[in-house]
Curated annotation (Swiss-Prot):
Belongs to the UPF0597 family. InterPro entries: Ser_deHydtase-like_asu, UPF0597. Coiled coil: none annotated. GO terms for molecular function: L-cysteine desulfhydrase activity. It comes from the Bacteria. The lineage of its organism: Bacteria, Pseudomonadati, Pseudomonadota, Gammaproteobacteria, Enterobacterales. Transmembrane segments: none annotated. GO terms for biological process: L-cysteine catabolic process to pyruvate. It holds the Pfam family SDH_alpha. This is UPF0597 protein YhaM. Signal peptide: none annotated.
């Protein structure tokens, strides 16, 4: 069944997952600004005394209400300050992993002194944009990130331009392993998952380790909205059944609780989002445990889940008005369906039902309430799988769902790319009015 050699398409699939599935400490939008600030601070010899920062509306939306790990505070200013004073510019999405208690205290003092300003970049044509300008005496350094959470495109200091990506940006775009996703299909992804050597995808088990640890932490502590631990108590009280469906709900939401509540544990992210990584991982883990799957089966199911989620999200803007926990849960539906019966038709039906169910869920910024949407998406995924196992699904006669799952995905993504742009603007306006 399994092939010993890896063909170029499969190698591209593996590279795509390795590029998009990475550890991340803290919500990735404020972390992107923290990285910009850390990279800017690394260009200075003295201590950072002041920070000015500019972000895109979408990054502002996803950074306003989320807790920065280790600080107990929400928002972009504390992320920028801690990045500059305690961040590791070489650590990417884990920029804050080694921030000391002193760095946290100094960052809070900088905020209290009014030395951190975070503003909207206007005009801004980039969905994901963050720029941090840090000052030390008469010296300054400025770092700009565009397009991806860790994609530094320009470094400049008072002495001149240190780095600019403009010259080689087009070449990097050509060589990105994600390019193959524009010319593949779910059937090819499934064929890859079924036949690729286990050793080539063993690395995906790290997602289970990291996101499983977050889930356990969410059940132990009182993080965020503590949805997972609350529902676990309701099970003990007899108000919620102790079954597989509930286990998926509780353990997935608990991981998101810990993630959004500021736990100092990394998530294995997907497509630049910790919550998407959690959603693509934990439901699959729970079902794998239920059916007694070994590590190899778990790895194949996780690879199907994560790669399917990346495949769908690749057709979306990096940030949009569409809650991407829903698309990550479509990947989870594929992984769970594969564990139960492995048929392509079951996987396709489950994804189609997901599109007919949760496709209208909006993203109103990163916050503790993301765990609600993660839990809803995970539950919908399992419901869609249960229907598909009995050959029942939302069909092409209903709504935006088409008779072909690939067209259904395209229909969903076209909504986010076009029609939901105005929705996104309205969400940002509402959130901005609350901040005043």
């Amino acid at each position: 069944m399994f092939e010993s050699k890896i063909n170029p398409l499969w190698q591209s699939f593996i590279l795509a997952v390795q590029e998009e599935v990475k550890p991340a400490l803290g919500c990735t939008e404020p972390i992107s600004l923290a990285l910009a600030a850390a990279a800017a601070a690394a260009e200075l010899d003295g201590t950072v005394e002041r920070i000015d920062a500019w972000v895109s509306p979408n990054l502002m939306k996803n950074g306003m209400g989320v807790t920065v790990p280790g600080t107990g505070m929400v928002g972009l200013p504390i992320a920028a300050a801690l990045g500059a004073l305690g961040g590791d510019a070489k650590a990417g999405l884990e920029v804050l992993k080694d921030a000391s208690a002193k760095a946290v205290a100094d960052a809070k003092a900088m905020l209290a002194a009014g030395h951190v300003a975070v503003m909207l970049q206007e005009p801004c044509n980039d969905i994901l944009f963050s720029r941090a300008k840090v000052y030390s005496g008469d010296s300054w350094a400025c770092v700009t990130i565009v397009g991806d959470h860790t994609n530094i495109v320009r470094i400049e200091t008072d002495k001149g331009v240190v780095f600019t990506q403009a010259d080689n940006a087009q070449e990097e775009e050509k060589t990105s392993p994600l390019g193959v996703l524009s010319h593949t299909s779910l059937e090819e992804i499934l064929a890859f998952v079924n036949a690729v050597p286990f050793d080539a995808i063993r690395f995906i088990l790290d997602a289970a380790r990291l996101n499983g640890a977050l889930s356990q932490e969410g059940l132990r502590g009182s993080w965020g909205l503590h949805i997972g631990s609350t529902l676990a108590k309701q099970c003990d009280r007899g108000l919620l059944a102790k079954d597989l469906s509930t286990a998926i709900l509780i353990r997935t939401s608990a991981a998101s609780d810990a993630r959004m509540g500021g736990a100092t544990l990394p998530a294995m992210s997907n497509s630049g989002s910790g919550n998407q990584g959690i959603t693509a991982t934990v439901p699959v883990m729970v079902v794998a445990e239920h059916v007694g799957a070994d590590d190899e089966c778990l790895a194949r199911a996780l690879m199907l889940s994560h790669l399917s989620a990346i495949y769908i999200h690749h057709q979306l803007p990096r940030l949009s008005a569409l809650c991407a926990a829903t698309t990550a849960a479509m990947g989870a539906a594929a992984g769970m369906a594969w564990l139960i019966d492995g048929r392509y038709d079951t996987i396709a039906m489950a994804i189609s039902s997901m599109i007919g169910d949760v496709s209208g869920m909006i993203c109103d910024g990163a916050s503790n309430s993301c765990a609600m949407k993660v839990s809803t998406s995970a539950s919908a995924a399992w419901k869609a799988v249960l229907m598909a196992l009995d050959d029942t699904a939302v069909t092409g006669n209903e709504g935006i769902v088409a008779h072909n799952v690939e067209q259904s995905i395209s229909n969903l993504c076209s909504l986010a790319c076009r029609s939901m742009q105005q929705t996104d603007k309205q969400i940002i306006e509402i959130m901005a009015s609350k901040a005043h």
